[in-house]
């Protein structure tokens, strides 16, 4: 004879606010040549309520920026074709894109890198490896200022 055991599992219930979001928190263009990092950033920002587009490098970013019209660009420093520094310079030189907030994502946030970014007009830095929540908060603040 087989005996069945009954058991109960209790788990806390977490209520989420599922109200329809009529307008995104802002538009973000995520620029990174590493597909995994690019998608990680994009998905986290989408879950937070941002409208997200992606680009594979600086050249792709410059080609997409007029169409996407982002409030914030997350920009990796080390990329092929056109790196993050040159991309940021070109964004700042163009009157049509100079207002866009730029977050540099870099493994190299040494003092001279930060100084260079400040000279270019970079708005914020996030150092790799990064906490997605830190990046989200940074983007939230910049998007709020941008709108």
Model-based region annotation:
Residues 79, 102:
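Receiver (REC) domain active-site loop signature in two-component systems and cognate sites
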